[in-house]
Every structure is written in C-alpha cells, then in structure tokens.
Amino acid sequence: LADLILGCRQLEALVRDAVAEFDRLDASHRDGVPMAFTISMNSLKITASRLVIEIVSQALILCGMAGYAQRTPLSLGRQLRDAFSAAVMINNTRILADNARMLSISSGMI
C-alpha cells in the first residue's frame, strides 16, 4: 500500500510541477512555445503513462483475485485497460523519437 500511495504522490507532483512550468511561461511564448517546454511536456506524458500503469498494477495486486475477476466491486480490469491506453493511443515510442529529434536540434537549450 505504501508503494501505491508513493506512486500516486509522484504522479501528482509531476503534474503539479508541469502546471507550474506552464504558468511560468512568459505571455510572449503563448503563440510559440519554447522547444524545451515541448520536450518537458512530452516527457511528462511518457512518465505519467508509465507510472499510472504501475499504480493500477499495484492496486490489482493488493486487491488479489477480487481485483482480477470481471464482475466484482473491486474489479480493476477497466482501470488497467485505461491505464495502458495512455501509452498505446498516443504511442510513447513515437513521442520518445520526437523528443530525441528535438534534443538533437536544440543541443544545449535545456
């Protein structure tokens, strides 16, 4: 349970930091977002999508068979499928490749 709570707090901190980073953007950047910010947000998406899978998987293990079974109040099948959708729908591999391209272009901007 402690690992599950820690994972939730890590995810919350990641999102809170990203919101703060967005808020710090100068108004002049609203039309053209700096590449470093784009890389940072892409990295947030990748990290968050991996972390949510880990969190739901840990919850499933805590619930045991009741979480694994389809028709119980503790069933986590839908949540696990939704957690994986974050990595699948907007593919993390493609985002990593985009980040690599931007980093190779920017070299030293971050």
Predicted regions and their residues:
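Extended amphipathic alpha-helical segments enriched in small hydrophobics
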Residues: L1-L25
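Generic structural signal for well-ordered, non-transmembrane alpha-helical segments
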Residues: A2-R9, N42, I46-I53, R81, ...
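Short, polar/charged, Gly/Pro-enriched helix-capping and turn/loop motifs at alpha-helix termini
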Residues: A18, L25, L62, A66-A69, ...
